[in-house]
Amino acid sequence: RPWLLRLIREVSGVEGIERIRLGSLEPRIITGEFAAELARLPKLCPHFHLSLQSGCDATLKRMNRHYNTEEYRERCGILREAFDNPAITTDVIVGFPGETEEEFAATRQYLEQVHFYEMHVFKYSKRAGTRAAVMPDQVPDQVKGRRSDGLLELEASMSREYREHFIGSSVWVLFEDMAEVEGRKYIIGHTPQYVKAALDILPAFYLSH
């Protein structure tokens, strides 16, 4: 943790770098002190990806994860206390061996309670040589698909709700690309929270660039 903070501070001091966005973080790295130090860096984007994998403690134990759902929830709370409406994203695996309907329901309820901006939902697939590949109670592909579809619907709803918080507000956008939709040209970029934004390009602007 100390070396990561030192690195972020050093990068923050580099002239010309205006945004620092962190990659995936281990949940246990998030402490009150760590989050408070990050919040003091104006270039640090309030977008944090904390991999969860499952919202059920029994499933997490079979996955050999070194945290539980309550610890994870506390980490999200720390970030939300340190930053104003941070974007928290995560990874979730459905259909891990032994995942029952009750465990999946617990995961879905947990995700709804913690509330994420985005979730990357993956269906568990066997990998030769891993402990999970030979575990009993492998989940059928059809069940994995149904569970994945359900969480993707939830993800779309939560993401839309998070983005709606910014309607009517002024935000900084880093424009990085151009796109054309139905004959109209737009410049595309992201806010510090990694919310995608599009700005209609006036014809005169487009021709001059």
Language-model segment annotations:
Residues 29-33, 52-63, 94-101, 118-142, ...:
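Flexible glycine/acidic-rich beta-alpha junction loops that bind and position SAM and/or redox cofactors
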Residues 92, 104-114, 121:
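A glycine- and small/hydrophobic-rich beta-loop-beta segment
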Residues 1-12, 16, 62-63, 126-157:
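Radical SAM enzyme [4Fe-4S]-AdoMet core and its adjacent flexible, acidic
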Residues 1-101, 112:
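Conserved SAM/AdoMet-binding glycine-rich loop
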